Amino acid sequence: MDEVKYPVLTEKSIRLLERNQYTFNVDLQSNKTKIKNWIENFFDVKVIAMNSYRLPEKGGKRGSMIVHPIRCKRMIITLRTGDSIPLFSEQ
């Protein structure tokens, strides 16, 4: 699926792993329903809650033009107690 780009491993996302919350970068046009269905079917887990936010645009200059690259959306996915995504397992 092209809508889920990759998992995010930052200080905040590693702290959230202790609360059974996983962070992914997703496509800007994707919605929570599509992402929830894909996560539940692909990883065989139960999604309890989802939060999303857009990353801020970073301005830059290309010659005399000011450009704002398109950023992606970030989803924080909370799973049911006992479920985990093997991609983030410590083993």
Curated annotation (Swiss-Prot):
A single BP term in Gene Ontology: translation
One Gene Ontology cellular component: chloroplast
The family this protein is said to belong to: Belongs to the universal ribosomal protein uL23 family.
Main function: Binds to 23S rRNA.
InterPro entries with a match to the protein in the record: Nucleotide-bd_a/b_plait_sf (IPR012677), Ribosomal_uL23-like (IPR013025), Ribosomal_uL23/eL15/eS24_sf (IPR012678)
Domain of life: Eukaryota
SUPFAM superfamilies: Ribosomal proteins S24e, L23 and L15e
Protein name listed in UniProt: Large ribosomal subunit protein uL23c
Organism per entry: Pinus koraiensis (Korean pine)
Pfam families (UniProt xref): Ribosomal_L23
GN (gene name): rpl23
Gene Ontology MF annotations: rRNA binding; structural constituent of ribosome
Compartment(s): Plastid, Chloroplast
Subunit structure: Part of the 50S ribosomal subunit.
Swiss-Prot/TrEMBL keywords: Chloroplast, Plastid, Ribonucleoprotein, Ribosomal protein, RNA-binding, rRNA-binding
